[in-house]
Amino acid sequence: MGKRKQIKDGDVSMGGTDPATGDSSDEDIDMVNVDFEWFDPQEIDFHGIKHLIRQLFDVDAQDLDLSGLTDMILAQPLLGSTVKTDGKDSDPYAFLTVLNLQEHADKPPIKSLTTYIKRKASGTPSLSPLAQLFSQTPIPPIGLILTERLINMPSEVVPPMYAMLQEEITWAIEEKEPYNFSHYLIVSKTYEEVESKLDAEDSRPQKKKKKAGQEKGERFFFHPEDEVLERHALCKGGYEYEHKHDEGHSDSKRAFQELGIRTAGSLILIEAGRFEGAVKEMAEYLSPQQ
C-alpha cells in the first residue's frame, strides 16, 4: 500500500508546465488526470532515484558518488518518500529524503558532497553563513534535503512529501535516532533564459546591441516551492556549475519562446525552527486552484 493514496480527494492534472511560473497553457496541451501514490524508498527504486539525483546536480553530478548517495537513501527506508503512478514496483517519478551530514560525515559519498557544497558556499558571498557552518569541526547536525522530480510532474505532489518527512523526523527523534537537526539545507537548481546561439549566428549587427543588457538574465525556479523556501532562509544563493555543458545545450532546451536556457545550482539554508512554517506556507502556495 502507498503511504497516501491521493492528494486530498482529487486527481492531479499532469500536463505541460512552464517551469518559470508553474503555470500551464491551455494551448496544444493534453491534460491527463493521474492518481499518485507515495511509498517508502525501496531497493527497486535504486536506478530511478540515482537518475533523479543525477538530474538534480546536472553536469556536476559526474563529480559525486551517485550510487553511494542512493544506497544511503535506501538504507533509511522509513524516512522520505517516492511518488509513483503504477504501484510500488513501478519507477519513481519524484523523491524526497533527508541525510544527516554530521552523522554520515566520514562516509565517502557525503565527504565528496560536503566538499563540493563547501566549495560552492565559500565562493558565493550570500552563502557565507553556510560556509561558516561547514568550516566547523564537527559539522553541525544539518539535514541535507535531496528532492527531484521529472520535469512534467505537477508541483502539488511536493507538499505531501514534506509533510510526511516532518512526521517521520518527529517519530525518529522519539526513537532517539539522529534526526534532531539544527538546520535544513535544500539543494536545488535554477535557470535563466539566454539568447539562442543558432539565432545569434543569423542575427544582424543591430541585434547584437541587445546582448550587453542580457548578460545577466532573470533567475527562474525549476521547483516553484523554492520561491517560498527562500523567504524563510537564513541564507540562499546560486552558483555556476564547475563543468560546462556541450555547445548547443541551451538550444536543446528551447522551450521558452525563442530563447535557450542556462542552468545553475542553488542552495537554501533554513534554521530548524523555521522549517515547519516554511512547509506550511509552501503547501498553501502550491495548493491546487479551486
UniProtKB/Swiss-Prot annotation:
**What InterPro entries does UniProt report for this protein, alphabetically?**
BCP1_family
Residue spans making up a coiled coil are none
Q: Which PANTHER family match?
A: BRCA2 AND CDKN1A INTERACTING PROTEIN, BRCA2 AND CDKN1A-INTERACTING PROTEIN
Its keywords, alphabetically, are: Cytoplasm, Nucleus, Protein transport, Transport
GO cellular component terms, semicolon-separated? cytoplasm; nucleus
Cite a single Pfam family from the UniProt record.
BCCIP
Keyword flag Nucleotidyltransferase? no
Annotated localization? Cytoplasm; Nucleus
Q: Which family does it belong to?
A: Belongs to the BCP1 family.
- Please report the name of this protein according to its UniProt entry: Protein bcp1
* Gene Ontology biological process terms in this record: protein transport
- Main localization of the protein? cytoplasm
Q: What does this protein do?
A: Involved in nuclear export, actin cytoskeleton organization and vesicular transport.
Q: Where is this region: Disordered?
A: 1-27, 197-217
User: Which domain of life does the UniProt lineage start with?
Assistant: Eukaryota
